[in-house]
Amino acid sequence: MKKHLHVIQSIVPGSIAEEMELQPGYTVLAINGQDIEDVFDYHYLVNDEYIEMLIRTADGTEEVLEIEKDYDEDIGIVFESSLMDDYRSCSNNCIFCFIDQLPKGMRETMYFKDDDSRLSFLQGNYITMTNMKDEALERIIRYKLEPINVSVHTTNPELRCMMLHNRFAGKIMEQLQKLYEGGIIMNGQIVLCKNVNDGEELERSIRDLSGFIPNIESVSVVPVGLSDHREGLYPLEPFNREDARKVIACIEKWQKKLYEEYGTHFIHASDEWYLLEGYEMPEEERYDGYLQLENGVGMIRLLTEEFHEGLKEAVTDGKKRHVTIATGHSAVGTIRKLAEELCEKFPNVTVDVYEIVNHFFGEQITVSGLMTGTDLKEQLQGKDLGETLLLPVNILRSGEDVQILLDDITIPELENTLQIPISIVQSNGQDLVDKILGRGEIDE
């Protein structure tokens, strides 16, 4: 196997590394005589009061640095690769995978599927664990890499193998048991597919996973996302209102039972289920501290609570102001309601809220995070958008240039087409209040 070179990209000012005169371009070869596989080896080995670091300088000279420091003090090295290793790709062929449903012609990086336990720890990514051997699980336990976020989908071994198209997928309960016995904190995710892993299979999954409380802190249930680009893929149906009612009833039944037994609600329906059925969002206490926000669980409740808190303290200078908010179908009702509340308090402010229909991925895709520049251009061009267009931060591609949308259209390009400045709203209600009122419009 090719050994990965751990090349220093930069040095943190004022750090031990700067004091030791380490330079970008140097390579870290070993610590305390041990080779470094990746970022977790590195952090585990540097957590000591005395270490010996073998480095190679830019001219090829190797030398050992003796470093004395506080036990958990960071050395101050930034490596060229944040993982200090290659990213591990997904070995599954899931029947619900959204990447398989992307339209052709997007940037190549959009089609990369990761399934890397290190990204689960570092970035909160969800992993299936199908590409993990026992040694990898033992490493997670040894290094106490938690929380680990697991894409479970079903605890039925045969069904999981079918859904993931992977013969190793049926070991999920044994893998979770090993992490549970190792004391690792976890979160789970179930992407629900109609007539596949719902109904009795969902009941089974919740029952099985609840056996790992308290180490599994929460599990989200999310409806499968279906784009218009599913040619040749497994035939999946969208959920309807009656389906949503049944899913919510199942989850709320288990929430009541588990809260009485363990003091945690544990299993959570994503906001999409409540929007599809037309129910009010659960009260804040039911979200157990919003452990599943990244899966769309509690986002609307949290946004609403934060918005109301921000609105209580808000003031304006009395000048007239007109802004536009663009959002997807899922959130449009909530955003309009919040905008009306603000305008009632501040009659000098006008807020127009436009629902953007997703033609790029397909009209069944209704979340704001998958809005594209193409659809924004087509549906907003020529309209009176006021002084500023507000867009949610989750439409920007993460990990890359923050000014780029999913379809490679940039914010400056969009501003030029629509002839209006764009302000990016962070994922909290306070920032929405501030941006509507014109406070803090210089984006990060």
PLM segments and residue spans:
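Auxiliary Fe-S-binding modules of radical SAM enzymes
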Residues: 1-31, 35-38, 49, 57, ...
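Extended, hydrophobic interaction surfaces within ordered domains
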Residues: 36, 52-54, 78-86, 268
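Solvent-exposed segments in extracellular or luminal domains encompassing
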Residues: 42-47
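Beta-strand secondary-structure signal
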Residues: 52-54, 64, 149
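Conserved residues at the C-terminal ends of beta-strands
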Residues: 100, 151, 222, 270, ...
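Structural preference for beta-strand elements that scaffold enzyme active sites
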Residues: 147-149, 185-187, 218-220, 266-268, ...
